[in-house]
């Protein structure tokens, strides 16, 4: 989604891993 794209661009590769963990914990993935 745009979140991964924006976060990946602004924060770097680690942001994508953080988003994955976030969605995984909340069951949104």
UniProtKB/Swiss-Prot annotation:
Keyword check for rRNA-binding: no
Residues that bear Alanine amide: 29
Any one annotated GO CC term: secretory granule
Keyword ATP-binding part of the UniProt annotation: no
Location(s), subcellular: Secreted
GO MF assignments: galanin receptor binding; neuropeptide hormone activity
Family matches, as Pfam families: Galanin (PF01296)
BP GO terms, sorted: neuropeptide signaling pathway
Keyword annotations of the record: Amidation, Hormone, Neuropeptide, Secreted
Protein role: Contracts smooth muscle of the gastrointestinal and genitourinary tract, regulates growth hormone release, modulates insulin release, and may be involved in the control of adrenal secretion.
Family recorded in the similarity comment: Belongs to the galanin family.
Stated name of the protein: Galanin
Organism: Ovis aries
